[in-house]
């Protein structure tokens, strides 16, 4: 993914 921050 693009936004794979793990939030």
From Swiss-Prot:
Keyword Secreted: yes
Keyword annotations of the record: Amidation, Neuropeptide, Secreted
A GO biological process held by the record: neuropeptide signaling pathway
One annotated Gene Ontology cellular component of this protein: extracellular region
Domain of life: Eukaryota
Localization annotation: Secreted
Repeat listed as a keyword: no
Modified residues (Leucine amide): 7
Similarity section: Belongs to the allatostatin family.
Protein name: Cydiastatin-7
Native source species: Cydia pomonella (Codling moth)
């Amino acid at each position: 993914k693009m936004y794979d921050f793990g939030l």
